[in-house]
From Swiss-Prot:
It is found in: Cytoplasm. Its cofactor is Zn(2+). Keywords: Aminoacyl-tRNA synthetase, ATP-binding, Cytoplasm, Ligase, Metal-binding, Nucleotide-binding, Protein biosynthesis, RNA-binding, tRNA-binding, Zinc. Belongs to the class-I aminoacyl-tRNA synthetase family. MetG type 1 subfamily. This is Methionine--tRNA ligase. A motif ('HIGH' region) lies at residues 12-22.
Length: 696
């Protein structure tokens, strides 16, 4: 029975070019979608540009154009690049659309009606020149820990320290250079910490539920905490004007944070497709839908897609994703993509250099699995593998046999030898390879297909049509040998069609056949079938083209300030390598042991009146002793939810007199210095730890 499937890829941010890191996901998704369609399933593939946010607004202003003009131009560039790599979206849309706005408003109003939206007053830095509130990455100053200048508002790239923007010394706006002012503003929060959300997410993200890969499910349980320990924090879903995005209903001057409406862009894009194609939107998004919904994403945006997004959908009365498939990042020659080395390669430059996009599609397929492991693009291996597998093995079968059919047999085939072991081998393996495609184990599928290709070539080598053609009286044998070779080639083309759609089209034209489907692996071309003249299908990779590509992508390592501020976006690209190491210099064990790390229990936690970031913690450090500590975690944790929790503190840090009192230590928390994963995460020891125990 045919399945009804809706598939999405993450939305690329409309503030930069598509590069080879992005293409891992879109090629992976496209292969899976093409396989589903070949298998007879009704499968729709939608995506869109992620178009909202402060960086879009500022870049448009810098270019002297409107945000609408900027996103329209970038949409054209992205569409061109995806088409160049044969990514076959059924709809590639924009989040800046009426459909997405309507869906965002609908979800928000339903969450509000369910009591899952609340307002809070927060304190933020404000740029008096640009007259806007500044995101953390748009504030710079001196690091409060090491004194390094020109550091961002959330972490120091010199010493790695994480802090609140208000901790910066001599802060200034990265946009105007002005000294920012602290101002209060009312913000809107989605109550992810609500017991209803927690209970739903514990079940939804569990390994037993099967929505996530095991490693992703394990990560979700870390973020949720142990049963009875709700580590979820409420999510700030609003931003203040001026902001390029959708205004929140009944809240003039307040806008949805871009990450609120970005995944809703999946719905908006599909709604647009439904209107054009006469599809039923509700059939795919009603809570009891029998259809299937799959999201392909990078592992760095799991937090949004596996926690916020399904919680929003479930409590707004929509279905949740059937499965969420997360993949790893791309490295090039074993390292992060780097502009200085020329390995931060854009899709446009790859195509302009003259490289065949199907070479990359095949190489990625050969490396991809169903896990979240990173994959490496080794440029030397890329050349060797494509030349060996695609040209030397696969295409070689047709090039060694087709010409004889055209020249000697008027383009007509003989009856195929159905019991030929190489033919039977492909037909018997087809269902197994289909299972690998379904499971996204593309690398395993490619290995099986290449083994079958080797067997096909062994058959051609054994019958030697080029020698039969020289011998008188061998016409029947030659005709049969070339017919069998072309039938083998056709069967292999079916198996490779999700990877090589353009080559498959050329093969269909050359063999004079209808578009191939997966079921065609079980049939052969009939005797007397007429084929067309063979035309060359694929050339070898010239290593000089790779050298040209690398040179074309080399540029200064110094990123533009605007590019540095894009850390939070939905685009799951790897950031280029910087000259600084992300690790601290080595210390010896004696230096480490000078830091007295202790397990503590949070005996009490309360807001600090007049402080926008601080929570006052009373810590039980064991031996009936308590310490008073101020922690900059207000944006991440409700103080009431911290009481009773175990964490880790630096017990021998010199007391520090603050405006609000004396701080007698420091609790430890983690944050993503690159901004890919938002939030602050208080450290927790394993079960069994007791206050006063030393960490060593």
């Amino acid at each position: 029975m045919s399945r009804k499937i809706l598939v999405t890829s993450a939305l690329p941010y409309a503030n930069g070019a598509i590069h080879l890191g992005h293409l891992v996901e879109y090629i992976q998704t496209d292969i899976w979608v093409r396989f589903q369609k070949m298998s007879g399933n009704e499968c729709w593939y939608v995506c869109a540009d992620d178009t909202h946010g402060t960086p879009i607004m500022l870049r448009a202003e810098k270019e002297g154009i409107t945000p609408e003009q900027l996103i329209a131009r970038v949409h054209g560039e992205h569409s061109r690049d995806f088409a160049g790599f044969h990514v076959g979206f059924d709809n590639y849309y924009s989040t800046h659309s009426d459909e997405t706005r309507d869906c965002a408003n609908d979800i928000y109003l339903k969450l509000r009606a369910a009591g899952l939206i609340e307002t809070r007053t927060i304190e933020q830095y404000y740029d008096p020149v640009k007259q806007l509130f500044l995101p953390d990455r748009f504030i710079k100053g001196e690091c409060p820990k090491c004194g390094a200048k020109d550091q961002y508002g959330d972490n120091c790239e010199s010493c790695g320290a994480a802090y609140a923007p208000t901790d910066l010394k001599e802060p200034y706006s990265a946009i105007s250079g002005a000294k920012p002012e602290l101002r209060t503003s009312e913000h809107y929060f989605f109550k992810l910490s609500d017991p209803r959300c927690e209970a739903f997410l514990r079940q939804y993200t569990s390994r037993d539920n099967g929505v996530l890969q095991n490693e992703a499910a394990n990560k979700m349980q870390e973020w949720l905490g142990a049963p009875g320990e709700n580590k979820l924090t409420d999510w700030d879903i609003s931003r203040d004007a001026p902001y390029f995005g959708f205004e929140i209903p009944d809240a003039p001057g307040k806008y949805f944070y871009v990450w609120l409406d970005a995944p809703i862009g999946y719905m908006g894009s599909f709604k647009n497709l439904c209107a054009r194609n006469g599809l039923d939107f509700n059939e795919y998004f009603k809570p009891d839908a029998k259809t299937e919904l799959y999201h392909f994403i990078g592992k760095d945006i799991l937090y949004f897609h596996a926690l916020f997004w399904p919680a929003e959908l479930a409590h707004a009365g929509f279905r949740t994703p059937t499965k969420i498939f997360a993949h790893g990042f791309l490295t090039v020659d074993g390292a992060k993509m780097s502009k200085s080395r020329g390995t931060f390669i854009t899709a446009e430059s790859f195509l302009k250099t003259g490289l065949n996009p199907e070479w990359l599609r095949y190489y990625y397929a050969a490396k991809l699995s169903a896990t979240m492991e990173d994959i490496d693009l080794s440029l030397d291996d890329f050349v060797a593998r494509v030349n060996s597998d695609l040209v030397g093995k696969y295409v070689n079968i047709a090039s060694r046999s087709a010409g004889f059919i055209t020249k000697r047999f008027n383009g007509q085939l003989a009856p195929a030898t159905a019991e030929l072991p190489a033919i039977k081998g492909i037909q018997e393996a087809a269902s197994r390879i289909a299972e690998l495609y379904e499971a996204r184990e593309f690398g395993k599928a490619m290995r099986e297909i290449m083994a079958l290709t080797d067997a096909a070539n062994q058959y051609v080598d054994s019958v030697k049509p080029w020698e039969l053609a020289k011998q008188e009286g061998k016409e029947v044998e030659l005709h049969a040998a070339c017919t069998n070779a072309l039938n083998l080639f056709r069967l292999l083309t079916v198996l490779l069609k999700p990877i090589l759609p353009i080559v498959a089209e050329k093969v269909e034209k050359f063999l004079n056949i209808a578009p191939l489907h997966w079921a065609d692996t079980q049939s052969l071309l009939a005797g007397g079938h007429a084929i067309n003249a063979y035309e060359h299908l694929m050339t070898r990779v010239d290593p000089k083209l790779i050298e040209k590509l690398v040179e074309a992508n080399k540029e200064s390592l110094a990123p533009a300030p605007e590019a540095q501020s894009q850390q939070r976006h939905a685009e799951h690209q790897q950031n280029e390598v910087t000259a600084e190491s992300p690790w601290e210099p080595f210390c010896n064990i004696d230096d480490f042991m000078k830091v007295d790390l202790r397990i503590v229990r949070i005996a009490n936690a309360e807001h600090v009146e007049g402080a926008d970031k601080l929570v006052r913690l009373t810590l039980d450090v064991g031996n009936n002793e308590t310490r008073n500590v101020f922690a900059g975690i207000k944006a991440a944790y409700d103080p009431a939810q911290l009481i009773g929790r175990l964490t880790v503190m630096v017990a021998n840090l010199a007391p520090r007199k603050m405006k609000f009192g004396l701080s007698e230590g420091m609790v430890l928390a983690a944050s993503d210095g690159e901004g890919k994963t938002p939030g602050i995460f208080l450290l927790s020891p394993d079960s069994g730890a007791q206050p006063g125990m030393r960490v060593k």
